[in-house]
């Protein structure tokens, strides 16, 4: 499970710039709950051997009691609670402020691993950049410059050191290939808990906590129609006697970790609310993670024909990048439409692990090129020579040839469609990688 790092500090110390450096992306999952005046942003990153999740927060005033500052303080406390380690960001140029003392006192009481990052330290004399911040009494300190990218790797190493993470090269996870690891993802109140409790009740599940670190999500083993599953908690599973029941407790971190840990993700939408920004964010994360996915539109019984048509258009427009996924219309509370969902989950898992032989892929490639050649780019016309499988879950197809950097995205989509049809790939992303042969005369006149 990826460790979680929370960025905490008063306003304008450079937390967002640091967030962008640590994640190397402008994209983020946003906890856009109704009524929030300041969102928490979540992003993936990897500096060094370990991947991690970073939470960016607003300016923190621990003692704020009214208005926007109270809400921002609550958001920051939630981020800290979700995290494994805190990076406390201060302004090396401005020096210590009263707010810094308040935040340091708050963090010290929590006892959570904390690293102090003195940001904006570029150009300051070495040795004076962090010296005064020793007064805050928070242990490890480092002078960094988020805007210049200075000290980023060392900062991550310091932050993750207390967690004693295993070496990724040595970390081996024994998985039963016969078990499908399933995560039910979705916004708050779309019906995840209702659906999961329906399954729990139907299957009379006996649950247990799988061994692992304290960051591991609770997993529930069960069997449906002879197929073994492992349900990964995203809805706040709570033990009730010998079984678990789900409560509607939304956690972005738990959702991201569950998606990463799953073989198949069931993305639940609310028919009464349409496709929201957060639905699209979660769907994008599922695609980015390469997970097989099934879409289920809950509360279908609560909308009329006109609303259903609008919803279908919304799915096509906002979730068009998941057009390979099966869509089901269900009512979790009435237990309607749930049977076909299981069939699609199993089909998506099988597609994600489909083996594709090199001869068949190469024949398919030649037929595709014969039917429609790639577009010429200036004097270059890409030549596609052969293809082979480069991985599974998600399936990866590697195509070799010449001048492949001139292959258009539309042509890649054309090839993807041919491959999907040939191998019946439903419910899984398909990644196509193009590898051009080296031209020995490229740099010679």
Swiss-Prot record:
Binding-site positions, GTP 2: 186-193, 233-237, 298-301
Q: Does the keyword Electron transport apply?
A: no
- Look up the record and give one Gene Ontology term from the biological process aspect: ribosome biogenesis
**Domain KH-like, residue spans:** 354-438
- Look up the domain of life of the source: Bacteria
Q: Name one GO molecular function term.
A: ribosome binding
UniProt keyword annotations, A-Z: GTP-binding, Nucleotide-binding, Repeat, Ribosome biogenesis
Residues binding GTP 1, per UniProt: 9-16, 56-60, 119-122
Pfam annotation, one family: MMR_HSR1
Q: Which InterPro entries match?
A: G_ENGA, GTP-bd, GTPase_Der, KH_dom-like, KH_dom-like_a/b, P-loop_NTPase, Small_GTP-bd
Which segments constitute the EngA-type G domain?
3-167, 180-353
Kindly give the PANTHER family that the UniProt entry links to this protein: GTPASE DER
* Main function: GTPase that plays an essential role in the late steps of ribosome biogenesis.
How it assembles, according to the record, is:
Associates with the 50S ribosomal subunit.
Q: Which HAMAP family does the record cross-reference, listed alphabetically?
A: GTPase_Der
Query: What family is this?
Result: Belongs to the TRAFAC class TrmE-Era-EngA-EngB-Septin-like GTPase superfamily. EngA (Der) GTPase family.
Q: What protein name does the entry list? A: GTPase Der
**Organism the protein comes from:** Polaromonas naphthalenivorans (strain CJ2)
